[in-house]
Amino acid sequence: MTTTSTHALAGLQAVDPRILHFTPLGLGGPMQAEDAADYQQRLVANLVLADDVAQTTRQKFEQLCAGYVQGALCYDLFTLVADAAQLTLEQALRDRFAAHHGGMITVQDRAACEHQIIYTTYPDFYEQYKKVRGSKIRMGTSNTWRGFNATLDGLLLWARREGLVRGQRNRHNERAKKALRNLTAHGTFHLLTPVEAYRALSDLAEIINHLWGHSTPGGRLYPAPITRDVVAIGWDNTTGSVVAGHAAQLALEDKDDELTYILVRAVFSPGERDDPNLMEYDARHATTHFPAQYLWGPGSRTQAIAWFEQAAPEPDICDHLDQVFVVRVHEGRVHLPMYPGVAGALQQAERQGTWYAIRADGPAEVFAHTRALSATESGHARMGECPHCPVETIASGDLHSVLRAAQTAGSDVTTVVAPDVRTPFADLMVPRFITVSS
């Protein structure tokens, strides 16, 4: 081997100096080359696909992961991997479509004539679909004929109607995914970092796993159901200070205090995952980031301990994607969203006005969308999926009809009698209504 070729091989084996600055603590001073390569390998090792994912999708994903690891030697590979991840989404959807329909599907052509297509792979289906000038397939639990163009756009619509992808924020992300795919396919030179490449791979892994029915613990897009602990929220009515802790810890102190307490089920795992809005809890309205359930109160510490020991409430798990909320608009005021069961227990005077049942991943989006509707802002959909907000309006009208629609949409409308109690932080940060001028 010549000296020149030896130097060329050594250059290919050397860690790219740019990768050394991407540390577990963020950008910083350079790590050792071996440590930098090991860190990137350990990152990508966390991305695991479910066992039942289609083999062709798995092979492509593993190829991307291998390319990511090699980015330690060639920094440009991070850009190539991130771009290829955008294109791989369509392959995953194609493979899931082929598996879902089991090799046979009935389609409609433009004249509404039906054709049965028997296929072995998605490309096989696609060729036959074009040949019969297919335009529609049946989608969803209602088996409704819907337009299907067999491209990424149509596949994403199909996956959502079949319940294989979900979440209203993810619906907006899907629109961005389509734009990114097109930008990648017709783009120009650009350079991405390992952070962006890993995010692309991580998101792709979550989407693929969810297409095959598996959520991701701690996931960004499709998180697994999260644990709600029994939490005591206490506040000082004089100073307005608010504290929170596990209800089981209330009995650990011998003395009583002057705080007012309520007990709720809420996401509360200090150091792991907390609800950022827990201190703004309102028993009647949805003000927390994750669903919170009223259990007891208000009362003193002694009373809270007594109820907790007698009732022995247990933690549970909850899913916060695609929740259903109801929200009231009355006399120019947009009120805070409520959970359907709580709204069902309202007195007649509190039921007046126009109500909306809205599907969303959190109450903030519901409130913002309803405020936009009340202010007659352009572009917001009064029914169905909103193009501007990550929400879907299910129904509007009086409370009774809206609750009935919420139940049909899968929401639990069992009546929950909640007291009119909220923390001082809620009074300060989250007014119960705003006045809107249309």
PLM regions and their residue ranges:
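Extended intrinsically disordered or low-complexity regions, especially N/C-terminal cytosolic tails and loops
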Residues: 1-74, 78-82, 226-438
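Amphipathic, non-membrane alpha-helical segments in soluble helical-bundle scaffolds
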Residues: 46-57, 75-82, 142-145, 149, ...
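Generic structural signal for well-ordered, non-membrane alpha-helices
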Residues: 55-62, 66, 87, 91, ...
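Short, flexible helix-adjacent loops and helix caps
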Residues: 69-73, 97, 189
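Short, hydrophobic, well-ordered secondary-structure elements
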Residues: 75-101
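Eukaryote-specific, cytoplasm-facing alpha-helical/coiled-coil scaffolding segments in long proteins
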Residues: 90-92, 110-123, 207-213, 227-238
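Flexible secondary-structure boundary motifs
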Residues: 96, 100-171, 180
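Charge-enriched, short contiguous segments at helix-coil
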Residues: 157-226
